């Protein structure tokens, strides 16, 4: 059995995987074959993309270094040799081995990243409330736009995102098309809850006074 993933999806997921994290199982890209998804998270934001996968194939984690090696071997632009990668797995004793095959026949075999990937589905908000204000790390917003553009194989410099905040839950970022999304945890402007509330109020008051013709409500 094999799962085939576009190089664009693999590159997009790598923008959200953890780097040198003690939770080593986050330092890679998770292929959830049960539901056909490619997933990556660093604990603060989460990338999810759709892929086609056999439902009876075991899920596995491709470590960052191996994923980056595969992406590099696929090439880019005029030097592209493969636009997709087929993954298969074999088990020996307590070890899971992954074989990645490119469209030109090149193959890479390496061990799967050990550990259990967290149940990412639990943090997906059940209710999205666009009226609740929240603050987000600015770099994470840029990374969300970049990841979604890469997934679509588009220019990240021209990418925009739709933001669907959910209060204290993760906000959902999409590009208006099905197949991929990024989840980002909101951040506190300060460690003082009262100060954060005042900051929201002050921002709205300033907005109303500076632009009296525009309605602004929390």
Predicted ranges, named:
Residues 1-218:
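DNA polymerase processivity clamps
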């Amino acid at each position: 059995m094999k799962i085939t993933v576009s190089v664009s999806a693999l590159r997009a997921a790598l923008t959200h995987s953890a780097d040198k994290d003690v939770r080593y199982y986050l330092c890679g890209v998770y292929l959830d074959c049960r539901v056909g998804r490619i997933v990556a998270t660093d604990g603060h934001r989460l990338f999810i993309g759709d892929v086609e996968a056999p439902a009876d194939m075991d899920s596995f984690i491709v470590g960052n270094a191996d994923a980056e090696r595969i992406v590099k071997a696929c090439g880019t632009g005029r030097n592209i040799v493969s636009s997709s990668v087929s993954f298969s797995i074999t088990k020996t004793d307590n070890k899971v081995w992954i074989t990645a095959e490119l469209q030109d026949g090149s193959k890479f075999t390496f061990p799967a990243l050990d550990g259990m990937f967290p149940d990412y589905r639990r943090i997906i908000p059940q209710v999205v409330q666009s009226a609740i204000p929240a603050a987000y790390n600015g770099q994470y917003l840029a990374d969300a736009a970049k990841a979604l553009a890469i997934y679509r194989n588009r220019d990240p410099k021209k990418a925009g995102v739709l933001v669907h905040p959910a209060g204290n839950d993760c906000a959902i970022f999409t590009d208006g098309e099905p197949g991929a999304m990024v989840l980002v945890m909101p951040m506190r402007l300060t460690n003082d809850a009262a100060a954060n509330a005042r900051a929201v109020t002050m921002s709205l008051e300033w907005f109303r006074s500076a632009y009296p013709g525009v309605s602004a409500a929390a």
